[in-house]
Amino acid sequence: MKSLLLLVLISVCWADHLSNNYTLDHDRVIHIQAENGPRLLVEAEQAKVFSHRGGNVTLPCKFFRDPTAFGSGTHKIRIKWTKLTSDYLKEVDVFVSMGYHKKTYGGYHGRVFLKGGSDNDASLVITDLTLEDYGRYKCEVIEGLEDDTAVVALDLEGVVFPYFPRLGRYNLNFHEAQQACLDQDAVIASFDQLYDAWRGGLDWCNAGWLSDGSVQYPITKPREPCGGQNTVPGVRNYGFWDKDKSRYDVFCFTSNFNGRFYYLIHPTKLTYDEAVQACLNDGAQIAKVGQIFAAWKLLGYDRCDAGWLADGSVRYPISRPRRRCRPNEAAVRFVGFPDKKHKLYGVYCFRAYN
């Protein structure tokens, strides 16, 4: 009891001491900051932005500070942009800014900068977009011990196409699948890209690698050889397989190109080697599979003549189905991988613009 009384007397004396030394004037305000209250808030006005290969895009990001928070405005603002990998396990550095100091990383060098529309604008501009730029980006703003983030998805206009090499179906491990797409002016597709293609009508009964290492395939018309006739349409998922040992096809993604895709008018049919040389003689190169799909899907290219492509396959693009030219649906028709010495086909060429 005596201890409690002594504690009360000490508290009263300490309060009197404070009141004699510190008076609350009209111009003096005490701010009590809630421990869990946000002192720095980062927001993206759009969760997803759209563009195309070769274009420019702004990834939106703004930050808001509590000016009444203790220490607000005394630290330099650090803005960091990273790209999230498809499996979300890693982040790839893109751009960092703090005051006058700025740094870009890797393939983004010379192509990215802050928009700087206002003092609280952390939006990132990416120029001359590549296929690899597709994905999710994280905007992180740091002030002292405070930080917050926002995520923006960059989507590219383009087309997904299934691919397998001359060796036949189910012959690519994951790493070979990645290279196969690159060789055809494309990149390995993401699940989101395949899903969007399925919603757009893509139906393919062979499983292929996706960028996250999963193996899947899209079915719009269920049938016995493709998961069963009584199943519902959807993207079938085989799961994740050994990237070195497991072998499947691949789904590739490509977008707009900066050049001209065309069927070469030639007086005779050509062998593969003659086709390659004919394009070179015309100031071009033999076209790749990704380029014929991009021309068909994005430009509406239509030609009922089978022609050689760079991988040794023979195909032709039909945008307006008609008799003798894929009468049932618009598609890039696949003839096959014929003997390269056969003198039976024309050639599709591609001339890049400088």
From Swiss-Prot:
The keyword Ribosomal protein does not apply. It comes from Sus scrofa. PANTHER family: AGGRECAN/VERSICAN PROTEOGLYCAN, HYALURONAN AND PROTEOGLYCAN LINK PROTEIN 1. It is found in: Secreted, Extracellular space, Extracellular matrix. Belongs to the HAPLN family. This is Hyaluronan and proteoglycan link protein 1. The keyword Nucleotidyltransferase does not apply. GO terms for biological process: cell adhesion; central nervous system development; skeletal system development. Keywords: Disulfide bond, Extracellular matrix, Glycoprotein, Hyaluronic acid, Immunoglobulin domain, Repeat, Secreted.
